Design a protein with these regions (language model features):
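Short glycine-rich substrate-engagement loop in P-loop NTPases that contacts/grips substrate
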Residues: 82-110
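Catalytic P-loop NTPase motifs of RecA-like helicase/translocase cores
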Residues: 94, 121-124, 152-153
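Walker A/P-loop nucleotide-binding motif
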Residues: 52-71
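Conserved P-loop NTPase "ATPase switch" module shared by AAA+ and STAND
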Residues: 107-128
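P-loop NTPase Walker A phosphate-binding motif
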Residues: 67-82
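Sensor-1/coupling segment of RecA-like P-loop NTPase cores
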Residues: 135-157
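A short, basic N-terminal segment
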Residues: 1-52
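Interdomain motor-coupling "hinge/lid" segment immediately C-terminal to the ATP-binding subdomain
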Residues: 153-186
Length: 186
């Protein structure tokens, strides 16, 4: 498959908002030319590291680069890996049972990288977040959970994801990084 464009794979019966294949590649393409946050390397290390029992939490205030980092990480994947990536936009109406069923379908279809945006919108996330690390990460999936609810992530890390998550907090942006990202001479 190397050298070919990513396939748009249809997964029937999914309950969550999943983007894969050509649509995902098109979204990721828009972020390739943007400068990366200093903490981007931590995300890359998680995605390409050997750890298979942890998830990655990417959280912080609005407009601090979380979605751009997700798209940049997806855009830097090989074409082979791109065919194994799914992006899920969590909604308030989603729950962990739905997510569990869809992640099983994705795993069985060969997906190994899953980016779940605004995961804390799900009402039962905090009480059942270990599903991501204890089941799917140990099966070999790299799962990145992102969102703006820092308290929700902190509560999940304190309970369900204790010692099972790599956290990347994007809220603090040093002036040197800010000026580099925006091309401001200081």
């Amino acid at each position: 498959m190397s050298g070919s464009s990513p396939k748009s794979i249809s997964i029937s019966g999914v309950e969550t908002d999943i983007t894969i294949g050509k649509e995902l590649a098109a979204v990721a393409q828009k972020s390739k030319a943007l400068a990366s946050r200093d903490c981007f390397e931590q995300l890359e290390m998680y995605l390409h590291g050997r750890s298979h029992d942890r998830v990655c939490l990417l959280f912080g205030l609005l407009q601090t680069g979380k979605n751009t980092m997700l798209r940049q990480a997806i855009g830097r994947m090989t074409k082979e890996d791109l065919s194994r990536i799914a992006y899920i936009k969590a909604r308030r109406t989603d729950n962990m049972a739905m997510m569990n069923r869809d992640l099983k379908k994705l795993f069985n279809a060969g997906f190994r990288y899953v980016f779940i945006d605004e995961v804390t919108l799900m009402e039962d996330f905090i009480d059942s977040a270990a599903l991501f690390s204890d089941v799917f990460a140990t099966m070999g999936m790299k799962i990145v959970l992102s969102g703006t609810d820092s308290l929700g992530f902190w509560l999940a890390m304190d309970e369900e994801l204790y010692d099972r998550a790599k956290s990347i907090h994007t809220t603090f942006i040093p002036y040197r990084e800010y000026s580099r990202l925006l091309g401001i001479d200081s």
